[in-house]
Design a protein with these regions (language model features):
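Catalytic Tyr-X3-Lys helix of short-chain dehydrogenase/reductase
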Residues: 108, 159-164, 196-197
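NAD(P)H-binding glycine-rich loop region in Rossmannoid oxidoreductase-like domains
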Residues: 57-94
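C-terminal substrate-binding subdomain of Rossmann-fold SDR/epimerase-dehydratase oxidoreductases
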Residues: 16, 197-327
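Residue-level signal for the nucleotide or nucleotide-sugar donor/cofactor binding architecture
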Residues: 36, 58, 87, 95-98, ...
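SDR active-site strand-loop-helix element
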Residues: 6, 30, 73-76, 115-121, ...
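Catalytic helix-loop patch of NAD(P)-dependent Rossmann-fold dehydrogenases
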Residues: 87-102, 113-114, 123-173, 178, ...
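Hydrophobic alpha-helix immediately C-terminal to the catalytic Tyr-X-X-X-Lys motif of short-chain
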Residues: 154, 158, 162, 192, ...
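N-terminal Rossmann/SDR dinucleotide-binding element
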Residues: 1-72
């Protein structure tokens, strides 16, 4: 495989690059470094099979040129700051929806025939399922709760349209839960750790702490993506597109995840809740995905939530530079 990875210097992207190189593939990375970190690619940069290109997904011509000769594109570049969406409403449209369109046009120009798109479980908004049932891939999309999720719905539609029109032989859409692990750089686990490193006696939680989330370790995420793409099921799918939920078979509320984080720190802070029931516009009160489809192919996660959260805390404690890099 000769792979092109957008968002290659980011959290998930850099882990994917390392895994692709470990499996012997050639990789071209693409990132504008708006949130990505060069340090995440230190190991990859020593490989003769890796080339990194600084560029933006809004620069379609440059991206098409860099993509030449690649057969598979992993599109992970995106603005993932859900909370900040309404402060900069054009960002999700430009980086996520228009960025995905540009990637697809670059794919068409470069002649790549296989694409994997990183979407999100947030596309399900507030799914019309019972209070504890996981959401399957065929659940209808309700009213969207964030600009980020809306932009990912647009991206999914573009990917499937290009595949249906014959511009892709295989398209894969992966709806992730929240991802944790080495090189993690945003999300409430990151925020809680930053607070506790500054003051272990107080922890401010946005929302009432009852929001229920599911988490997946980044190594399980990368393995799931490569496992599904490697099977090639989209080649025989009715519309050349396969959609997979990626997550664990469990969830945890924010208050309990705060407990795991505090235990890893050896801290017992005073908890303070702010922002009402949810904490910010766009926060989903319940994300729990039905992963039976991808599990039926032979993939399953190795890390539980109780393992992934402390592992992430340990990495952040060992790499405090990342907090300054993301400030």
């Amino acid at each position: 495989m000769k792979a092109f990875v957008t968002g290659a210097a980011g959290f998930i992207g850099s882990n994917l690059v390392d895994r692709l190189l470990a499996e012997g593939h050639e990789v071209i990375g693409w990132d504008n470094y708006s949130t990505g970190q060069e340090r995440f690619l230190e190991a990859a940069s020593r490989s003769p099979r890796f080339r990194m290109v600084r560029g933006d997904v809004l620069d379609r011509a440059a991206m098409s040129k860099a993509m030449a000769g690649c057969d598979t594109v992993f599109h992970l570049a995106a603005n993932a700051d859900i909370r900040d969406g309404w402060a900069h409403p054009a960002r999700d449209l430009e980086q996520n929806a228009l960025g995905t369109f540009n990637v697809l046009e670059a794919v068409r120009a470069a002649g790549a025939r296989r694409l994997a798109f990183a979407s999100t479980g947030s596309v399900y908004g507030e799914p019309a399922v019972s209070a504890s049932a996981p959401t399957p891939e065929n659940a209808p999309f309700p009213t969207q709760t964030s600009l980020y999720a809306a932009s990912k719905v647009a991206g999914e539609g573009l990917v499937s349209a290009y595949a249906e029109a014959g511009h892709l032989d295989e398209a894969y859409v992966f709806r992730f839960v929240s991802i944790l692990g080495d090189r993690y750089t945003h999300g409430h686990v990151f925020d809680f750790c930053r607070q506790l490193m500054h003051d272990s006696g107080r922890l401010r939680i946005l929302g009432d702490g009852r929001q229920r989330k599911s988490y997946l370790h980044v190594q399980d995420c990368v393995e799931g993506v490569l496992h599904a793409v490697g099977r090639g099921a989209a080649r025989s799918a009715p519309h050349r597109t396969e959609v997979y939920n990626l997550g664990t078979d469990e969830f945890i509320d924010v208050r309990a995840s705060a407990g795991l984080i505090c235990a890893a720190f050896g801290a017992n802070p005073r908890l303070e809740f702010a922002g009402g029931e949810r904490g910010w516009v766009g926060d989903s009160p319940f994300i729990f995905l039905d992963t039976r489809k991808v599990r039926a192919t032979g993939w399953s996660p190795r890390f539980s939530i109780a393992e992934a959260v402390p592992a992430t805390v340990r990495w952040l404690q060992a790499n405090p530079w990342v907090f300054a890099a993301r400030s």
